Regions:
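Domain-level marker for long, solvent-exposed, non-transmembrane regions
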Residues: 1-109
Length: 109
């Protein structure tokens, strides 16, 4: 999954990033990942362009791309995603597999 957070200058990289929907329900965070994968490569990668995100080794072909809307209050490592993108993620059949493997890249400003 690629989280496009461009335009959200307040987003800061974190060891334990979280993605929530507009109602605050977590759609990606520590509860979704394998401890082994997180220790090996971190919960997510960070980059500055969509092009580099698409070619990152942790991302497979045809990644789900979601757009970050804002950060959650003062928690600048918690990105709020739209409810419609969150629904797409929850409906993806491989949803738990790629999240468990920390196959997430966050594109920053």
């Amino acid at each position: 999954m690629i989280v496009d957070a461009k335009g959200l200058s307040e987003v800061k990289p974190a060891i334990v990033p979280k993605i929530v929907d507009e109602s605050g329900q977590e759609i990606y965070g520590p509860a979704f990942v394998s401890r082994e994968y997180a220790l090996q490569a971190g919960m997510s990668g960070y980059t500055h362009t969509l092009a580099s995100a698409k070619t990152d080794p942790r991302i497979k072909d045809n990644p789900l791309i979601v757009k970050g809307l804002k950060t959650k209050n003062l928690e600048r490592s918690v990105i709020v995603d739209s409810n419609s993108d969150a629904a797409k993620l929850r409906q993806a059949s491989e949803h738990l597999s790629f999240l468990r493997k920390c196959s997430v890249i966050i594109v920053l400003e």
